[in-house]
Amino acid sequence: MRVELGTISLHHFEGRVMAQSITTLTSANFDETIGSSDLPILVDFWAEWCGPCKAIAPVLAEIATEQAGKITIAKLNVDDYGDIAMRFNVMSIPTLIVFNKGEAAKRLVGAQGKGKLLQELAEFLPT
């Protein structure tokens, strides 16, 4: 079960509810959000019809909860905001781009497991 309320999503996993903040990006807030963040931002370029995108959603939700205050997790729907996807040369989804200090610093294409994602994000997370 998933209910979206602004930037707060509630996910139901194995009988418990986990809440975390996942930022929804649009053309109106993308540049300001990326440019003004003190934290690294992992942007998930996704679409509603994309099976692998749906498969990694719970993984991103877990990371958002576990790494709160260390990294921001954000999502951008490529069907709604294709201009931004084109700007960052997103050709396949899911594409995950880590923005650090306003710049695209790392790109991952395809569904990733939690361990692999955390390994890829380690250089951006405080120790």
Label every PLM stretch briefly.
Residues 78-85:
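Structural microenvironment flanking redox-active thiols in thiol-disulfide oxidoreductases
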Residues 45-59:
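Conserved redox-active cysteine motifs that mediate thiol-disulfide chemistry
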Residues 38-39, 45-49, 92:
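Short pre-active-site segment immediately N-terminal to redox-active cysteine/selenocysteine motifs
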Residues 38-40, 55-76:
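Conserved helix-turn-beta segment immediately C-terminal to the redox Cys motif
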Residues 1-17:
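Short, Lys/Arg-enriched N-terminal segments with co-localized hydrophobic residues
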Residues 26, 46, 72-74:
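Conserved Rossmann-like nucleotide-binding pocket used by diverse enzymes
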Residues 22-41:
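A short beta-strand-turn-helix
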